[in-house]
């Protein structure tokens, strides 16, 4: 059984072995030919000739993660709609109605997120009720 598999996939095995050997050769040559300058300046990050200031670990707002999630959601939507558009003739009116329902549900979800303020990246304004009385 192993002999049958080996006969059928010998070209792929040679390709994998060649790719691994090529990677090992490139890593080995980089280690042999690369510079080895060590010093205090080598341990600092390079920022286009400007001395680095502050900590590199910055806190990101949760809004950035929300934008990333929206991107993934609508990217998957585009993937499904692309697959539908390729087979639109075979799916007929039933496929069109299903795609319209899918797009409608996504639009309802988008309108809901817009309505609750999930798409607003600016901070909310303070209410005018916090004023001091004169």
From Swiss-Prot:
GO terms for molecular function: NADH dehydrogenase (ubiquinone) activity; NADH:ubiquinone reductase (non-electrogenic) activity; quinone binding. It catalyses: a quinone + NADH + 5 H(+)(in) = a quinol + NAD(+) + 4 H(+)(out). The chain crosses the membrane at residues 12-32, 64-84, 93-113. GO terms for cellular component: NADH dehydrogenase complex; plasma membrane. Pfam families: Oxidored_q4 (PF00507). Gene3D superfamilies: NADH:ubiquinone/plastoquinone oxidoreductase, chain 3 (1.20.58.1610). It is found in: Cell inner membrane. It is a multi-pass membrane protein. It comes from the Bacteria. Its main location: membrane. Keywords: Cell inner membrane, Cell membrane, Membrane, NAD, Quinone, Translocase, Transmembrane, Transmembrane helix, Transport, Ubiquinone. Its EC number is 7.1.1.-. InterPro entries: NAD(P)H_OxRDtase_bac/plastid, NADH_UbQ/plastoQ_OxRdtase_su3, NDAH_ubi_oxred_su3_sf. NDH-1 is composed of 14 different subunits. Subunits NuoA, H, J, K, L, M, N constitute the membrane sector of the complex. Belongs to the complex I subunit 3 family. NDH-1 shuttles electrons from NADH, via FMN and iron-sulfur (Fe-S) centers, to quinones in the respiratory chain. The immediate electron acceptor for the enzyme in this species is believed to be ubiquinone. Couples the redox reaction to proton translocation (for every two electrons transferred, four hydrogen ions are translocated across the cytoplasmic membrane), and thus conserves the redox energy in a proton gradient. This is NADH-quinone oxidoreductase subunit A. It comes from Aeromonas salmonicida (strain A449).
């Amino acid at each position: 059984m192993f002999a049958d598999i080996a006969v059928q996939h010998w070209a792929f095995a040679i390709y994998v072995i060649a790719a691994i050997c090529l990677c090992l050769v490139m890593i080995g040559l980089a280690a042999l030919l690369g510079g080895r300058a060590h010093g205090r300046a080598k341990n600092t990050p390079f920022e286009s000739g400007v001395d680095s200031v502050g900590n590199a670990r910055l806190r990101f707002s949760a809004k950035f993660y929300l934008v990333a999630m929206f991107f993934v959601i609508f990217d998957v939507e585009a993937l499904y709609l692309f697959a539908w558009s390729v087979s639109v003739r075979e799916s007929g009116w039933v496929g069109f109605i299903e795609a319209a329902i899918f797009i409608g549900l996504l639009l309802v979800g988008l309108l809901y997120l817009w309505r609750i303020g999930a798409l607003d990246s600016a901070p909310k304004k303070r209410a005018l009720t916090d004023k001091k009385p004169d």
